[in-house]
């Protein structure tokens, strides 16, 4: 197993009553809450933390892309990664990643990732998320029903730009380029830098990831128990495709608290966890699921899962196995999100 350190770079000074007075941390969060001078210190603290994670031996340090929000202050993770490429020596740099459908043309991603790979000496891990609905459909105005098609076309263009040796023309539905010939080229060219696909559980995403032989990284905010359905589905798909269950085919993001004892870890973890779950994930439902964003297979699986859960709740024999949701104890809920 390899350990990676992932930084969202959230705005750390949202007010205590944020989720009561403000409808959403994403898309329409008010600009008056942002203090650029305080953000100066935040960014430098965040960079120090990432560099320290590299120094103490994490196998990779990870950054990602979000827009118009207080949840993650990296509209361009490539800027952060390029600095880290210069300031670190042997830790992998996982940009998880660039929301491909937002780039026009997507070859900009191919070029910038190639730069990072060259600066770092071949340490880039290239992440290609489909993107959250808040980022893609609302902050950047993409059509939700076309988002995945746009994403897949952009992926094909970036991959060809990395691997084809001669200049070529690309004539897609969303991207037309007469001359594709990127300079620089990535150091990792056999055939390209490793590609990771971060996801929140969309069936189409992990199925496609399995077919492409990419690493699927599940972004789990609610513990390994909640992630079992997604990861079991991914491994079952790999088995159907006749591929081995090498654990390095998958990643699993999990929030954790570490200290000398379990109680100390819980004491240290509770306040930041409550800040993150209470404020950084305070998203207005009107931004969460635009029509056309969630695919049919994922919707069907969600409905089936709700029906199974409802059946279990109605069955007295299973009520005792429903976990912390029935305990009504705040600290237990926090614990199960990262310490269980």
Predicted regions and their residues:
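Internal, glycine-rich beta/alpha segment that forms the wall or movable "lid"
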Residues: 14, 107-214, 225-232, 236-241
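Hydrophobic faces of well-ordered beta-strands that scaffold small-molecule active sites
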Residues: 3-7, 61-63, 93-96, 124-128, ...
């Amino acid at each position: 197993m390899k350990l990676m350190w992932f930084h969202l770079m959230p705005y750390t000074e949202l007010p205590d009553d944020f989720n009561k007075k403000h409808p959403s941390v994403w898309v329409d969060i008010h600009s008056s809450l942002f203090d650029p001078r305080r953000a100066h210190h935040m960014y430098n603290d965040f960079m120090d933390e990432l560099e320290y994670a590299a120094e103490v031996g994490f196998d990779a340090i990870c950054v990602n892309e979000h827009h118009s929000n207080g949840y993650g202050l990296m509209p361009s993770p490539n800027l952060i990664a390029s600095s880290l490429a210069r300031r670190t020596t042997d830790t992998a740099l996982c940009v998880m990643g660039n929301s491909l459908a937002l780039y026009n043309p997507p070859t900009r991603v191919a070029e910038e990732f190639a730069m990072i790979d060259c600066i770092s000496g071949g340490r880039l891990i290239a992440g290609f998320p489909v993107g959250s609905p808040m980022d893609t459909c609302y902050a950047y105005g993409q059509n939700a029903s076309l988002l995945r098609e746009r994403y897949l076309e952009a992926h094909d263009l970036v991959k060809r730009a990395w691997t084809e040796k001669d200049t070529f023309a690309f004539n897609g539905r969303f991207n037309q380029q007469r001359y594709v010939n990127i300079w620089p080229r990535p150091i990792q060219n056999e055939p390209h830098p490793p590609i990771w696909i971060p996801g929140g559980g969309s069936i189409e995403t992990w199925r496609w990831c399995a077919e492409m032989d990419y690493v699927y990284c599940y972004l789990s905010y609610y513990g390994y128990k909640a992630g079992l359905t997604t990861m079991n589905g991914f491994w079952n798909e790999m088995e159907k495709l006749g591929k081995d269950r090498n654990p390095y085919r998958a990643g699993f993001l999990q929030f954790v608290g570490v200290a000398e004892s379990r109680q100390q870890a819980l004491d240290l973890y509770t306040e930041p966890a409550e800040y993150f779950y209470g404020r950084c994930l305070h998203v207005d439902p009107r931004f969460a699921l635009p029509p056309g964003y969630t695919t049919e297979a994922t919707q069907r699986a969600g409905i089936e899962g709700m029906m199974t859960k409802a059946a279990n709740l109605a069955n007295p024999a299973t009520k005792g196995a429903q976990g912390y949701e029935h305990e009504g104890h705040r600290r237990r809920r926090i614990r199960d999100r990262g310490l269980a």
